[in-house]
Amino acid sequence: MYYVIASLLGYIFGCIHGSQIVGKLKGINIKDGGVKNAGASNTTILLGWKYGIVVALIDIFKATAAIFLLLILLQGNAIPTQEQHIYIYLTALFVIIGHNYPITMQFSGGKGTASLVGALIAIDWRIALIGIGVLILFTIATDYLAVGVLSMYISFLITTYYIFGLAPFFIVVGLSVLSIYKHIENYKRIIGKEETKLSSMFGKKAS
């Protein structure tokens, strides 16, 4: 029963899209321009960093809120701690599936980076601190967000295994494969020196 609740809860929250909300307010479809992706980075490319931050905050908050709501639902049900961890990670997985493949956007969404950050915050402060730190470090060092995201997933795999064990680790493996698949075009553009750099994104003024 709780597997279904965690999955549905995650997917429903995942379908709340920051880029869709901002896009409607600005009268544009974020997926129609830039790198054709419904996420914070493409919003930054099209509308400037202020709108990109708004989208990122919405997508971060929805993941954190979904996991916190799950924890409230689990309270008082005498569920073993290890089992709770699986439900938490399952919720995180489906938030990102909902973000990447939202029914509200004909199953064509973003890449789940901001939502993963929100999930890390809700899962464990140590995992969040290391993961976000790695994301920032490698993104700034390479000037490519996609490299920072890949590094964050690697850190998430390692910290999950050491803190929560094998079952949640396998869920993160699934998340990592999904992220790599969603970022394949970014990696191709990086190799071809065609990827938009982080520094150029934040050089764009909000419109």
Curated annotation (Swiss-Prot):
GO process annotations (BP): phospholipid biosynthetic process
GO molecular function, one term: acyl-phosphate glycerol-3-phosphate acyltransferase activity
Pathway in which this enzyme or protein is active: Lipid metabolism; phospholipid metabolism
Predominant location category: membrane
Ranges that cross the membrane: 3-23, 53-73, 85-105, 127-147, 154-174
Protein topology in the membrane: Multi-pass membrane protein
InterPro entries hit by this protein: G3P_acylTferase_PlsY (IPR003811)
UniProt keyword annotation of Protease present: no
Enzyme Commission (EC) number: 2.3.1.275
Catalytic reaction list: an acyl phosphate + sn-glycerol 3-phosphate = a 1-acyl-sn-glycero-3-phosphate + phosphate
Keywords, in A-Z order: Cell membrane, Lipid biosynthesis, Lipid metabolism, Membrane, Phospholipid biosynthesis, Phospholipid metabolism, Transferase, Transmembrane, Transmembrane helix
Localization: Cell membrane
SMART domains: G3P_acyltransf (SM01207)
Family of the protein in this entry: Belongs to the PlsY family.
Quaternary state and interactors: Probably interacts with PlsX.
Protein name, entry field: Glycerol-3-phosphate acyltransferase 1
Organism: Oceanobacillus iheyensis (strain DSM 14371 / CIP 107618 / JCM 11309 / KCTC 3954 / HTE831)
